UniProtKB/Swiss-Prot annotation:
InterPro entries: PSII_PsbL (IPR003372), PSII_PsbL_sf (IPR037266). It comes from Thalassiosira pseudonana (Marine diatom). Belongs to the PsbL family. The gene is psbL. Keywords: Chloroplast, Membrane, Photosynthesis, Photosystem II, Plastid, Reaction center, Thylakoid, Transmembrane, Transmembrane helix. One of the components of the core complex of photosystem II (PSII). PSII is a light-driven water:plastoquinone oxidoreductase that uses light energy to abstract electrons from H(2)O, generating O(2) and a proton gradient subsequently used for ATP formation. It consists of a core antenna complex that captures photons, and an electron transfer chain that converts photonic excitation into a charge separation. This subunit is found at the monomer-monomer interface and is required for correct PSII assembly and/or dimerization. Coiled coil: none annotated. One of its GO terms (cellular component) is chloroplast thylakoid membrane. This is Photosystem II reaction center protein L.
Length: 38
């Protein structure tokens, strides 16, 4: 458990931050589109 655990945790954290970044971009895109169409 002391071997591949930190590496796996780092990859999982990186993937989570990537998903949060994509979600933030999606929300900003929706807000900008609502401003433009309004």
């Amino acid at each position: 458990m002391t071997g591949p655990n930190p590496n796996k945790q780092a990859v999982e954290l990186n993937r989570t931050s990537l998903y949060w970044g994509l979600l933030l971009i999606f929300v900003l895109a929706v807000l900008f589109s609502s401003y433009f169409f309004n």
